[in-house]
């Protein structure tokens, strides 16, 4: 990795939130910050139509204006800019972030009930890159995110005990340790479908299954507790839909961390339903970490 954070800009109101969060995170990490803007050329059959000159000038001004503002507020940061045109924005962002530690994108709020829009570029970029992607919220048209990278609140991690969680745990533990805040690890689970046919469920069965999951989670976390002895770990095994349990735990979180399986299926990479729900409904910044 290059000790660099890349943030994608598209000129929307969510840009300010994403750039501010990325700048705070870069200060926490002692990392450089790269501002990236990509313009797609219009497609007409096999031909592409270059952008008009005013649009190119606007893109250059967007990058320079954002850089100048961040330097006024974070004078010690090393900030670079990169603009490109003619390629799909998701491809450009994924390529720019290939050797970065983090890619930061904005998402726009629709209100407390509707949730957030993760734009088409963001949705296309996340499956394209193995770099962790953080989605930063802009609420109700406001430019500022609800939480900056250094704000109080725990880091909340959603895990699936059936998957390899090492990369998620490494990312979440490091983020919580960097912020000197607790790490809440949540695993939501449901009873196997066969139990739905039982007229009366033996309460001992549910307890036995929950105890087994708690043991599994404790064993999973043990090496990380040794690696981060100062980290306050709160492990939770909760009966219920995983996305709902993660969102409940994420209220007031500094950062929410969820996973995305690294897959290359014939129909293309995708984002799983739990991560998709958290991306669209968590009010805190959401980190999507690719894992095996």
Predicted regions and their residues:
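Structural beta-alpha unit
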Residues: 1, 14, 71-103, 110, ...
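Gly/Ser-rich helix-loop-strand patches that form or flank binding pockets
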Residues: 19, 24-28, 95-145, 250-292
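A conserved short alpha-helical segment within the catalytic HATPase_c
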Residues: 63, 67, 218-222
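A short acidic, glycine-rich active-site loop
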Residues: 52-62, 203-213
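Short glycine-/small-residue-rich Rossmann-like dinucleotide-binding loops
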Residues: 10, 67, 108, 160, ...
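Generic structural signal for helix capping and beta-alpha/helix-loop junctions
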Residues: 43, 143, 193, 245, ...
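Small/aliphatic-rich secondary-structure junction motif
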Residues: 1-52, 151-203, 225, 232, ...
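General small-molecule cofactor/ligand-binding pocket signal
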Residues: 34-36, 80-84, 134, 184-186, ...
């Amino acid at each position: 990795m290059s000790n660099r954070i890349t943030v994608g800009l598209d000129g929307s109101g969510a840009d300010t939130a994403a750039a501010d969060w990325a700048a705070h995170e870069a200060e926490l990490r002692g990392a450089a910050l790269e501002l990236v803007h990509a313009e797609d050329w219009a497609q007409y059959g096999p031909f592409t139509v270059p952008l008009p000159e005013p649009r190119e000038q606007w893109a250059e001004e967007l990058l320079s204006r954002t850089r100048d503002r961040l330097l006024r507020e974070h004078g010690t940061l090393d900030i670079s800019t990169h603009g490109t045109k003619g390629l799909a924005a998701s491809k450009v962002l994924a390529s720019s972030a290939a050797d970065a530690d983090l890619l930061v994108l904005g998402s726009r709020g629709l209100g407390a009930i509707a949730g957030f829009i993760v734009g088409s570029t963001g949705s296309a970029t996340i499956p394209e890159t193995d770099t962790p992607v953080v989605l930063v919220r802009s609420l109700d048209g406001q430019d500022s995110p609800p939480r900056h990278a250094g704000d109080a609140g725990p880091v909340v991690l959603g895990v699936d005990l059936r998957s390899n969680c090492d990369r998620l745990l490494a990312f979440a533990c490091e983020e919580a340790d960097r912020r000197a805040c607790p790490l809440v690890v949540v695993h939501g689970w449901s009873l196997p479908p066969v139990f739905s046919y039982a007229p009366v469920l033996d309460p001992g069965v549910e307890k036995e299954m929950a105890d087994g999951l708690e043991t599994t989670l404790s064993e999973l976390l043990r090496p990380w507790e040794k690696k981060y002895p100062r980290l306050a770990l709160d492990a939770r095994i909760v009966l219920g839909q995983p996305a709902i349990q993660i969102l409940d735990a994420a209220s007031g979180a500094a950062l929410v961390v969820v996973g995305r399986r690294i897959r290359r299926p014939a129909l293309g990479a995708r984002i799983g339903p739990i991560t998709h729900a958290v991306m669209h409904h968590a009010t805190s910044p959401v980190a999507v970490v690719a894992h095996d």
